[in-house]
Amino acid sequence: MRSSAKQEELVRAFKALLKEEKFSSQGEIVVALQDQGFENINQSKVSRMLTKFGAVRTRNAKMEMVYCLPAELGVPTTSSPLKNLVLDIDYNDAVVVIHTSPGAAQLIARLLDSLGKAEGILGTIAGDDTIFTTPASGFSVRDLYEAILELFEQEL
């Protein structure tokens, strides 16, 4: 197998292991990769890969400190449309919630506020990566949700 293909296979295996969120030490990751047939892997290589892919230690569902990869976020470019900053749109009985790339919520909220009541938006509250939007009088939350989906060309 070519070394670049072997490297790609190693990266895939490494990322798959971290997605399991059960490895609390670099040594455990080394052993798991060796068990998958990557004999030449060592702690130093795992450490470099953790840094390269931005892995962090965090608590999993069992409250154990484990290594995991951050959510893969598309970094916006000067030519990318705003819709690429919107990651998810959902709603309940009261508000529409929009999740964005980190740092983009206030920009998207300002756009929504500029559309105003005529488009069904009473107002928005934005944090770093989350927006709460409430419908204007005469609009249902579902109507607002569908209008925002259409605006950002998201799938239902």
Swiss-Prot record:
<dbReference type="InterPro" id="IPR001669">
    <property type="entry name" value="Arg_repress"/>
</dbReference>
<protein>
    <recommendedName>
        <fullName>Arginine repressor</fullName>
    </recommendedName>
</protein>
<dbReference type="GO" id="GO:0034618">
    <property type="term" value="F:arginine binding"/>
</dbReference>
<keyword id="KW-0055">Arginine biosynthesis</keyword>
<keyword id="KW-0804">Transcription</keyword>
<dbReference type="InterPro" id="IPR036388">
    <property type="entry name" value="WH-like_DNA-bd_sf"/>
</dbReference>
<dbReference type="GO" id="GO:1900079">
    <property type="term" value="P:regulation of arginine biosynthetic process"/>
</dbReference>
<dbReference type="GO" id="GO:0003700">
    <property type="term" value="F:DNA-binding transcription factor activity"/>
</dbReference>
<dbReference type="GO" id="GO:0051259">
    <property type="term" value="P:protein complex oligomerization"/>
</dbReference>
<keyword id="KW-0805">Transcription regulation</keyword>
<comment type="similarity">
    <text>Belongs to the ArgR family.</text>
</comment>
<keyword id="KW-0238">DNA-binding</keyword>
<comment type="pathway">
    <text>Amino-acid biosynthesis; L-arginine biosynthesis [regulation].</text>
</comment>
<comment type="function">
    <text>Regulates arginine biosynthesis genes.</text>
</comment>
<dbReference type="GO" id="GO:0003677">
    <property type="term" value="F:DNA binding"/>
</dbReference>
<dbReference type="InterPro" id="IPR036251">
    <property type="entry name" value="Arg_repress_C_sf"/>
</dbReference>
<keyword id="KW-0028">Amino-acid biosynthesis</keyword>
<dbReference type="Pfam" id="PF01316">
    <property type="entry name" value="Arg_repressor"/>
</dbReference>
<dbReference type="InterPro" id="IPR020899">
    <property type="entry name" value="Arg_repress_C"/>
</dbReference>
<keyword id="KW-0678">Repressor</keyword>
<dbReference type="Pfam" id="PF02863">
    <property type="entry name" value="Arg_repressor_C"/>
</dbReference>
<dbReference type="GO" id="GO:0005737">
    <property type="term" value="C:cytoplasm"/>
</dbReference>
<keyword id="KW-0963">Cytoplasm</keyword>
<dbReference type="InterPro" id="IPR020900">
    <property type="entry name" value="Arg_repress_DNA-bd"/>
</dbReference>
<dbReference type="InterPro" id="IPR036390">
    <property type="entry name" value="WH_DNA-bd_sf"/>
</dbReference>
<dbReference type="GO" id="GO:0006526">
    <property type="term" value="P:L-arginine biosynthetic process"/>
</dbReference>
